[in-house]
Curated annotation (Swiss-Prot):
PANTHER family: BNACNNG10540D PROTEIN, F-BOX PROTEIN CPR30-LIKE. It comes from Arabidopsis thaliana. This is F-box protein At1g20360. InterPro entries: F-box-like_dom_sf, F-box_dom, SCF_F-box_component. Residues 1-48 form the F-box domain.
Length: 302
């Protein structure tokens, strides 16, 4: 393959899966050098579809952060995490950046392989999640209170502080933690939905509550509002999923019971419009949990 023109070689290599491309490094030095070129890496990874990281709720102990293609002379962050017996948690992702917890908070760029450590000592909320010595998250189900927003090449981390019907917001813009002057009060008490990450849409983070209402907060303007629920009361067996419909650029709320699955779209007047309702598949009573229900939603709608 050494005799092939570079543009033809690129077209061949661009068609390879990451695993096959990594194996090409051992073929000869010329191809290894070509694959390791930053320009080739940038073009290759820009052609890849989005991938999913399979992290268990208790954190992944064996997560490798070493890239597939580039040579890495120093020990990667993932290898350090394994040797330190740290667990890896993905707290959020936005615009190609990842918010990771590996014995501490990191904002990482998987393409450039750069990361930034964030000192959590000034935060009121982050230390409440951690176990001894920051090795693991003691309350990962509450880690969904952490929002991650990236806009105009800047990132902000927003932690929502829940106190009965009152909500405060803690912000980190990369330099320090501070408490926003903005607070919001709800008419009734309803806990934030556990294990449900906030949805980032049009510059605003949205946290779902168990009654179907939503706490919305804009990290730039620091304005907050309560989006009312489309339901009159909480149904015991009802499961809720908040998402963003990229096609119409609106929030979508999916509710599921043992009988039906309903899809609602947030309209301009802050009211929910029923977009679709279908009969639910048969599930055993002990199988109707959040994980099973989310998998069912994925198979039905996506």
């Amino acid at each position: 393959m050494n005799s092939l023109p570079l543009h033809l070689l690129d077209q061949i290599l661009f068609r390879l899966e990451p695993k096959s491309l990594a194996m090409m490094k051992s073929t000869n030095r010329t191809i290894n050098s070509h694959i390791s070129d930053p320009l080739f890496e940038s073009e290759y990874f820009s052609r890849l579809e989005s991938s999913l990281y399979n992290l268990s709720p208790g954190g992944a102990r064996y997560v490798m952060c070493q890239p597939l293609v580039s040579s890495c002379k120093s020990m990667s962050m993932g290898e350090k995490a394994i040797q330190g017996n740290f667990r890896c948690y993905m707290l959020g992702s936005c615009s190609g950046l990842l918010l990771l917890y590996i014995g501490g908070l990191f904002v990482a760029n998987p393409l450039t392989k750069r990361f930034r450590y964030l000192d959590p000592s000034g935060s009121k909320f982050i230390p409440t999640l951690s176990g001894d010595r920051w090795i693991y998250l003691a309350h990962p189900e509450r880690a969904m209170c952490v929002g991650f927003a990236v806009d105009r090449k800047r990132f902000k981390i927003v932690c929502i502080l829940e106190m009965e019907t009152r909500y405060e917001f803690e912000i980190n813009d990369g330099d320090s933690w501070r408490l926003s002057k903005t607070t919001i009060n709800a008419d009734s008490k309803s806990d934030l939905t556990k294990w449900m990450k906030p949805v980032y849409l049009e510059g605003t983070l949205h946290w779902l509550r168990n009654d179907g209402s939503i706490i919305a907060f804009n990290p730039e303007t620091e304005q907050a509002r309560l989006i009312p629920s489309g339901f009159h009361q909480e149904v015991p067996d009802m499961k809720l999923l908040l998402a963003a419909d990229d096609k119409i650029n609106r929030l979508t709320l999916i509710s599921g019971t043992k009988q039906t699955i309903s899809v609602y779209t947030l309209l301009g007047n802050l009211k929910w419009g029923l977009a679709r309702r279908i009969k639910n598949v048969s599930l055993k009573e002990n199988e109707l949990n959040a994980g099973t229900w989310l998998c069912t939603m994925a198979s039905v709608f996506w």
